[in-house]
Amino acid sequence: MMLDPINHHFQAHEEAYYSRFFNEQRGLHMIKVLPGGVYVSDQEELICTGLGSCVSACIWDPVKRVGGMNHFLLPFHNHFEEKHWHADELLSGASRYGSYAMEMLLNQLLSLGARRERLRMKLFGGAQMMGFHSMIGEKNVEFVLHYAEQEGLEVVAYDLGGLEPRKIMFDPLTGKAWLKRIPFAEINHLRREEERYAHTLEKQTDNDSEVELF
């Protein structure tokens, strides 16, 4: 979704959840989606993100030529809750937050004229990063695959799980995606970014009423 740069509320949203820069080599604007963010576009630009334990859904309508990406992590209050959670627990706080992250992306696509029956999806992320919530990547993968199946969304490609973080680049008009494994030297920065996001979620999800299930 293209946001009005004059509107200060949207400026604050951009600073918090995504950043925009011009890639001279490709001659295109690129939008980096940060943890907790959603970005949708019908413009000639590329959407990118870095993923450790988080997951991203890249969804597009090939007829309308509109697409978008989210970047999220399921919130768990403790290791016991994380270990025993399953994707069919639809009313749990983690499932409701995950559904909210997916519906935010879907609703913004539909608002730009996409048709739900035409939507295609590619899924990335969910790595098991050492020293960071040992099962969180696995649970994120379980959730997003279960959600796609339950909602009847066509998953045409995915690269999920494993041990290596990823960099993703996505063309919202064509659905083409590029994946690159993140070198070990960059892992600590990504881990810190996701840990800050997870800590923020722990505070926000103490009151589940703040998350609406569509």
UniProtKB/Swiss-Prot annotation:
Record's function text? Probably deamidates glutamine residues to glutamate on methyl-accepting chemotaxis receptors (MCPs), playing an important role in chemotaxis.
Task: Kindly state which keywords UniProt assigns to this record, in alphabetical order.
Answer: Chemotaxis, Hydrolase
Please spell out the taxonomic lineage of the organism that makes this protein: Bacteria, Pseudomonadati, Pseudomonadota, Gammaproteobacteria, Vibrionales
Any Pfam family hit: CheD
Q: Does the keyword Transport apply?
A: no
Protein name according to UniProt: Probable chemoreceptor glutamine deamidase CheD
Give the family from UniProt: Belongs to the CheD family.
Q: What is its EC number?
A: 3.5.1.44
Which BP terms in the Gene Ontology apply to this protein? chemotaxis
Say which enzyme class the record assigns. Answer: hydrolase
Which NCBIfam families does the record associate with it? PRK13493.1
Checking InterPro entries in the record gives: CheD-like_sf, Chemorcpt_Glu_NH3ase_CheD, Cytotoxic_necrot_fac-like_cat
Q: Which gene encodes it?
A: cheD
